[in-house]
Amino acid sequence: MSAAEGPLVVGVDTSTQSTKALVVDVATGEVVASGQAPHTVSSGAGRESDPRQWWDALREALHQCGDAAREAAAVSVAGQQHGLVTLDAQGAPVRPALLWNDVRSAPQARRLVEELGGPKAWAERTGSVPGPSITVTKWAWLAEHEPESVRATTAVRLPHDYLTELLTGQGTTDRGDASGTGWWASGTEAYDEEVLGHVGLDPTLLPRVVRPGEVVGTVRDSAGLPFAKGTLVAPGTGDNAAAALGLGLRPGTAVLSLGTSGTVYAVSTRRPADPTGTVAGFADARGDWLPLACTLNCTLAVDRVAALLGIDREAVEPGASVTLLPYLDGERTPALPHASGLLHGLRHDTTAGQLLQAAYDGAVHSLLGALDLVLDEDADRSAPLLLIGGGARGRAWQQTVRRLSGRAVQVPEAKELVALGAAAQAAGVLTGEDPAAVARRWNTARGPVLEVGERDEAALARIAGVISDAAPLLEREADQR
Ligand SMILES: Nc1ncnc2c1ncn2[C@@H]1O[C@H](COP(=O)(O)OP(=O)(O)O)[C@@H](O)[C@H]1O
Ligand SMILES: O=C(CO)[C@@H](O)[C@H](O)COP(=O)(O)O
């Protein structure tokens, strides 16, 4: 037996690059065991992963947790948002999942926006103007390009739903993750039958949307995982909504998450509806809202630039007037799905370290542009930004965010806030507590604060100028290059 004070729970984060599992003491928030196993994502035109890998990675991550996982009384799975998982009558994937950062459905997104009333109508209806990340556009792409896959599909799931169903045998999802599909109406909090009819998706193929705090089932014996009989399963949610739980986030505090995706978000009590499409009007996992902007190019893109230059990711140098837009995967914020990376202002005396700093600046610029938009008007804009995700460990990321935001930056010591949020949700179904209150009790946001500095307006203006001047290049579709 572990020396934990309270019951134990397991929180899972199945994100783009890996699945992580934490075993957490409900009384103290102490992480008593952890595990992590990688996934692979296809390269080339699309971004796909075989969902069976996520299950194998979950088993491996739990195996690494050892006996502590066997003692867990509840588990919850948080996962990368938006991925389209199509299952056949046996529950097996019909094809690999189309991930959030697959931009092939950009034409379908454009068409759907036009056909169903334009950007404002979509924002009011679903909270978001669908771009290629949003699941409904992926379903429309599949219907057009692989009608045989659509015909073979008897269930449609998101990544966290897929794993939760393998645990419980029940097809369920939650409002946080459902709000990223484009077929969930944020006004009524129900599936939008008109949108579904428009794309030919039968609503009976979708999972039941459970209430926050509902126990969705218990772990099946047949799951073959190291859980005791009767282990409760919590609803789970999308990874950003889980991190908001994991931070015990209150309205008015902004979060910047630096992982495969870059995201900026805040909790709001007001239902968002941004007709420009910059802010996605997601629901959170508790009953509030999570206005969020997301970039496709964050840590992987900057690490790629460092690798190309042959230098360490921390080997940045200041003082350049070079601009690097690191849109290696196309971009979502700004909405440039067909863009590629762009370099401007290179001189004989530009150093490799300056080029790398320019890549950090380009990545952070996109996120900061949306910062004010995700915060309510009455938010305290002098409060520190919370910096999380794998990139938050890096000094170059921390200093870039501090310099370009002109805000104080707080870096929580807790490393895995998505998995911690899932653990807080699992604790909530066990004790009846609000998961965000659990996380506050665990003091998960604790960490050093980098003091406020002067905002680098010159760099911000230079980057904005290049984006604007290069618009025709950045907007050009791949086959026009
Ligand atoms: N010390 C560090 N400094 C900078 N970046 C880091 C550091 N540690 C990890 N990373 C970056 O974090 C990323 C993984 O972050 P994570 O939030 O786990 O991603 P995801 O949840 O999207 O799978 C990797 O791409 C890696 O480049
Ligand atoms: O698409 C979004 C948010 O809308 C992404 O944030 C995904 O949820 C993937 O997250 P990570 O794997 O980068 O954590």
Q: Model segments located where?
A:
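N-terminal glycine/serine-rich phosphate-binding loop of ATP-dependent small-molecule kinases
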Residues: 1-96, 124, 152, 227-232, ...
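Active-site core segments that coordinate phosphate-bearing ligands/cofactors
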Residues: 10-12, 106, 113-126, 134-136, ...
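Short beta-strand-loop/turn "lid" adjacent to the catalytic site in phosphate-handling enzymes
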Residues: 63, 67-100, 126-133, 160, ...
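Extracytoplasmic ligand-binding clamshell segments of periplasmic binding protein
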Residues: 205, 211, 240
